[in-house]
Amino acid sequence: MNQSLLSQFGTSEERVKRAIEAFKRGNGVLVLDDEDRENEGDLIFPAETITVEQMAKLIRYGSGIVCLCITDELCQQLDLPPMVQNNTSINQTAFTVSIEAAQGVSTGVSAQDRVTTIQVAIADNAKPQDLSRPGHVFPLRAKKGGVLARRGHTEAAVDLASWAGHKPAGVICEITNDDGSMARTLEIVEFGKKFNYPVVTIEDLVRYSSSKVV
C-alpha cells in the first residue's frame, strides 16, 4: 500500500479512529483492502443509520452490487442459507441468498426500496418471513473474529459498526471509476478528498483490532 498517499489521512491509528468517529455520526468510510488481495476500495455505511441519499450514492458511484454485511447469528435468525453450497470464490466471499423486504417495497431495486429491505433485515426480532428471496440486496456473512479472522470488507464493515456502537451490520459497495474499471488506491484517495470520507485500510483495522485484544 502506498503509505505516502494515505499519510494525508493520518497515521494508521488516527485513520481508524477517524473512521470510527465517522461511523458514530452515521457517515461513510472508504476501506481499502490489501494490494495482493482484491486491491479495491469499498464505500461503507453503518446499516443501522443508512439513508436513501447514502444508498443513492452507493448505487451511483459503485458497482451496483450493494451488500449487507451481517453476523452469522443474524444469518441464522433470518434463515439465510449460503448462495451456493460449494463456494469456489478465491476470497471465499460468503454471499447468502439475496433478499427483499416482504412488504413496503415496489420492484425492490430503487434506493428507497433497498434501504427498506436493510431496515427490515436488521430490525430487532426480525423473522425469516419478513423477507422475500431472491431480491436486490445481497447479504454477506461475516466471519466470527472480524478482520483478525478474515481480512475482508465484510468483516471490516461489521467491526467498524460494532466499534462505533451500532448494530454489527454495514452496507458496502465497491467504488468504480467513470469508465467502469475498479477504483484503486489513488482513485479512492481522490474520492475520499472530494466527498470528505475518511480512508482506512484493512491492515489499519487489523492492527487496531489486535491492539484491542492484547
From Swiss-Prot:
List of residues binding Mg(2+) 1: 38
UniProt function note: Catalyzes the conversion of D-ribulose 5-phosphate to formate and 3,4-dihydroxy-2-butanone 4-phosphate.
Keywords: Lyase, Magnesium, Manganese, Metal-binding, Riboflavin biosynthesis
Record text on cofactor binding: Binds 2 divalent metal cations per subunit. Magnesium or manganese.
Residues where D-ribulose 5-phosphate binds: 37-38, 42, 150-154, 174
Listed name of the protein: 3,4-dihydroxy-2-butanone 4-phosphate synthase
GO molecular function annotation: 3,4-dihydroxy-2-butanone-4-phosphate synthase activity; magnesium ion binding; manganese ion binding
Binding-site residues for Mg(2+) 2, renumbered to this chain: 38, 153
HAMAP family documented for this protein: RibB (MF_00180)
Reaction(s) catalysed (UniProt annotation): D-ribulose 5-phosphate = (2S)-2-hydroxy-3-oxobutyl phosphate + formate + H(+)
Coiled-coil parts of chain: none
GO biological process: riboflavin biosynthetic process
InterPro entries documented for this protein: DHBP_synth_RibB-like_a/b_dom (IPR017945), DHBP_synthase_RibB (IPR000422)
